[in-house]
Every structure is written in structure tokens, then in C-alpha cells.
């Protein structure tokens, strides 16, 4: 049994249509990253973990993600294949490590989509509450019999809509996604412009109420805030999962990843700075923090606009991540590690239809049953684990194949940056609770079971 059989470096699979340009990739990345994190998580993280110093947490999280983005950019330019970290590790470490990375990526995007759907539901409920409407209790929250909630209906309904959209022509869907991203920017720009006139510098006086926190094992403070805000940047790697559909991938993928990450970081810092300046940070422990802050300063009209736009545009994150998740499942099935039905393409649109249906169904179930806070921590730890693997893979790539050639993206300061990334990611992982680690362990065991129960025996490498 050879668990470490490899694919050749740069092996590409035809089949999908190449139609995505640099602008499409930037919009895909921003659409995935600017969502629940900026509309919801910023408020709860400021209230419970870092206070106004959350802007420092964001810079730390962005730095960590930025390191990994550089690695993704180099891999994408040297190994142009759909599947992201999974495909890169397949070429460097072999099948079993690649499967672990691929499985963790599926877990990441499945929980990310469901988390965003939950954030969308929170804003929609807030808007309904302002109109005096409320869903029946049994359908108005994730599973918690003690308070009478059993399923959150709204995240399930929005995932049905998103799945239907992603099953349409991919180019048309991403054009629609671009329009919604621009609408999202209009709401955030309005928030910043209105918020500037309602800033109270006294709200920043207690800048770091929870301190810096512990480098390893902390539960509050700037580092704990950074570990949670890591959630905000997840999705940048979605670009590398659609390489087979990108024009000039070796040039456009690195540019798309870096540019979308830079734009997103600036936007998060501005919004968090204004948010914590408008309202005392302790009051921000709400699920619709941006709209809530506007209503607190008497700008209810702007708060309602932000709520409406959030309802419309959080769908962009669901679209971007469902798009990426379906391509990840397709990649695993194409290599024989998941049932071959998952690699079936629609004869006309060339969209992996069964993989898309599975992706949407898993996200709908998770969003309807699990609370947002537990979703965010679980997907973060899954992502951090495979980013550690990716950093090790870059070190091995450079050792065995040397520096990138002409026209390929080159990560600077190797091996310093990969080693630094490993240290930072491991530090973030220690910030999570025992229950998060248990969920991570169970997910790993399930993934290993699928690998040995199905994947190894059906792998294309057997042929």
C-alpha cells in the first residue's frame, strides 16, 4: 500500500471552460471574504475578545493569511490545476496527505458557506423584527430544545437559492456576483461616511480591554481576536480552486489572490475602526453589528439600507464559496477519491452539477442545525491545519525543484516566511476550545475512514 504516490508536477486536467479573467478573480475573492466577517463577526469579536484593539487583531490575521496567500500564488503559478492545496500537496507529498488537505478544505468551505448563510439569516430576522414579524420559534434557531428551537429555516432556504444559481452558467453567475459585490461596497461606504460624523473618541479610550492575550492557549485578547478574525479572510484560496476555468492562470491567479486580499484588509480595518468609535464595544455583541451601530446613533434609515444590502449581498459569499466547494469535490472525484458521480459535468454548461448539489445540501444542513460561533471556530481550525501542511509543502517544493522559473510567482524570504507561517498558524490553533478540537478530531477520523474505505481503492493512480 503506497499512501504517498504522487502526481506529476504541473499535471492539468481538461474539461472545464476557461472564461475567468483577472477582474472575475478579484471579485470572486472579495465576494468570498467580505461577508459575515465584516457584517457580524466584527461586532461579537470586539465585544467579547479584543475591544477596539480588534483592528490589531485584523492586521495580525491578515498577515497570517497574507503569508499563505503568497504560498498559494507560487503553487498556482507552478502547478496550474484545480483543487487548491489538495492538488499542490498531491504533487509534493503524495495522495494521503493530499486527501487530508482536500478533506479539510471541504470541511472549511462547507462550514464557511453554512456560517455565511446563518449570518444572512440574522440580518433578515433583524429586518423582519423591525417590521414586527417573527418566524415560529421551532424554525427560528439552530438545534437547542431547551429554548424550543430545532432548525433555522432561513439558512436552508437561502442555500437552496444559492445552489440553483451556481448550477447556472458559471460566467453569468459570476457577472451577477460582481453586481452584488459592488452593491455591498455601497453599503459599507455609506456606513463609513455616516459613521465618521458620529465618532466618539471616548469609545477608543479603553483600547485593549482584554490585553494582548496569550500567544498559545489564550481565550481572550488581541490574539484570540486574531484567531477568530481569521474567519473573515477565508475564501481567498477559492481563486486557486478554479484554475481550469481561468485564462492565463499562471499570471492571473497570483494577482487575483494578492489584490483581493489587500482590498479586503483595508476595508475590514476601516469598518472596524468606525464601528468601535460609534458605539461602546461592549454593546456590539449582536449578530447585525454594522446595522445596529447605525441605528444606535439615530441613523435608522442607513441601518435599514445596510440590513437590506447585507441580505442581498451576503449571498455573494455563499455563491463564491459554493462555487469553490463544488470544484473541490469535483477535483477529489476526478482523482477517484470520491464517487465518480461527483465528477459528472453538465453537457452544455460544463458545470459539475452533482458536486454542486452535494455542496449546497451539506451547507444547508449545517447552517440549519449548528450555531454561527461554533461554525466559525471549526472552519478556522480546519483551515489552519492544512495551511501548516501547505507551508511545509513549499519548503519541500523549493528543496526538490528549486526556485520558480521565468514568469512564475516567487515567494520571498524562503524558508523564513514558511516557518513563520507554521508558528503563527499553530499559535492560532491553540486559541480554540476543547470542543472545537474534538470536532476537528472527529472530522479527521471521518475523512481517514473515507480515504481507506473508498478513496484508496478507487484512486485514478491505481490505473
Ranges and model annotations:
Residues 17, 22, 152-156, 247-255, ...:
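Loop-to-transmembrane helix boundary motifs in multi-pass membrane proteins
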Residues 16, 147-151, 341-353, 387-437, ...:
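C-terminal membrane-solvent junction of multi-pass transporters and transport-like membrane proteins
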Residues 1-43, 47-52, 65-70, 82, ...:
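Membrane-interface "cap" regions at the ends of multi-pass membrane proteins
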Residues 17, 41-145, 260-263, 440-448:
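Extracellular loop-to-transmembrane helix junctions
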Residues 11-17, 55, 132-153, 179-308, ...:
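Helix-loop-helix junctions that connect adjacent transmembrane segments
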Residues 44-50, 54, 105, 116-122, ...:
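Transmembrane helix-loop boundary segments of multi-pass membrane transporters
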Residues 104, 121-124, 150-201, 257, ...:
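Membrane-interface loop-to-helix entry segments
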Residues 39, 104-122, 228, 233-246, ...:
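Membrane-helix boundary/coupling elements in multi-pass transport proteins
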Amino acid at each position: 500500500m503506497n499512501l504517498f504516490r504522487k502526481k506529476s508536477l504541473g499535471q492539468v486536467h481538461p474539461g472545464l471552460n476557461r472564461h475567468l479573467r483577472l477582474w472575475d478573480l478579484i471579485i470572486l475573492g472579495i465576494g468570498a471574504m467580505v461577508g459575515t466577517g465584516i457584517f457580524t463577526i466584527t461586532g461579537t469579536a470586539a465585544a467579547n475578545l479584543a475591544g477596539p484593539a480588534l483592528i490589531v487583531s485584523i492586521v495580525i490575521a491578515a498577515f497570517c493569511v497574507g503569508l499563505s496567500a503568497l504560498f498559494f500564488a507560487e503553487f498556482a503559478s507552478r502547478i496550474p490545476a484545480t483543487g487548491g492545496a489538495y492538488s499542490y500537496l498531491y504533487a509534493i507529498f503524495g495522495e494521503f496527505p493530499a486527501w487530508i488537505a482536500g478533506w479539510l478544505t471541504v470541511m472549511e468551505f462547507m462550514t464557511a458557506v453554512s456560517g455565511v448563510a446563518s449570518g444572512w439569516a440574522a440580518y433578515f430576522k433583524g429586518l423582519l423584527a423591525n417590521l414586527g414579524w417573527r418566524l415560529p420559534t421551532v424554525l427560528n434557531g439552530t438545534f437547542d430544545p431547551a429554548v424550543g428551537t430545532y432548525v433555522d429555516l432561513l439558512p436552508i432556504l437561502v442555500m437552496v437559492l444559492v445552489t440553483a444559481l451556481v448550477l447556472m452558467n458559471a460566467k453569468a453567475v459570476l457577472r451577477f456576483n460582481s453586481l452584488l459585490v459592488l452593491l455591498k461596497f455601497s453599503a459599507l461606504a455609506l456606513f463609513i461616511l455616516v459613521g465618521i460624523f458620529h465618532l466618539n473618541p471616548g469609545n477608543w479610550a479603553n483600547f485593549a480591554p482584554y490585553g494582548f492575550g496569550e500567544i498559545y492557549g489564550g481565550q481572550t485578547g488581541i490574539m484570540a481576536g486574531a484567531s477568530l478574525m481569521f474567519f473573515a479572510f477565508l475564501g481567498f484560496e477559492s481563486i486557486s480552486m478554479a484554475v481550469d476555468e481561468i485564462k492565463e492562470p499562471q499570471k492571473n491567479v497570483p494577482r487575483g489572490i494578492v489584490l483581493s486580499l489587500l482590498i479586503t484588509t483595508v476595508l475590514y480595518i476601516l469598518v472596524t475602526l468606525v464601528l468601535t468609535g460609534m458605539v461602546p464595544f461592549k454593546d456590539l455583541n449582536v449578530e447585525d453589528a454594522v446595522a445596529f451601530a447605525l441605528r444606535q446613533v439615530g441613523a435608522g434609515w442607513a441601518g435599514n439600507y445596510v440590513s437590506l444590502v447585507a441580505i442581498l449581498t451576503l449571498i455573494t459569499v455563499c455563491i463564491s464559496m459554493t462555487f469553490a466547494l463544488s470544484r473541490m469535490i469535483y477535483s477529489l472525484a476526478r482523482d477517484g477519491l470520491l464517487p465518480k458521480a461527483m465528477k459528472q459535468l453538465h453537457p452544455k454548461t460544463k458545470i459539475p452539477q452533482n458536486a454542486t448539489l452535494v455542496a449546497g445540501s451539506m451547507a444547508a444542513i449545517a447552517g440549519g442545525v449548528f450555531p454561527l460561533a461554533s461554525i466559525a471556530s471549526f472552519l478556522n481550525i480546519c483551515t489552519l491545519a492544512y495551511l501548516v501542511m501547505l507551508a511545509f509543502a513549499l519548503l519541500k517544493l523549493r528543496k526538490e525543484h528549486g526556485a520558480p522559473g521565468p514568469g512564475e510567482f516567487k515567494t520571498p524570504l524562503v524558508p523564513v516566511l514558511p516557518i513563520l507561517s507554521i508558528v503563527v498558524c499553530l499559535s492560532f490553533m491553540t486559541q480554540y476550545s476543547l470542543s472545537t478540537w474534538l470536532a476537528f478530531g472527529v472530522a479527521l477520523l471521518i475523512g481517514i475512514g473515507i480515504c481507506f474505505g473508498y478513496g484508496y481503492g478507487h484512486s485514478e493512480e491505481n490505473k
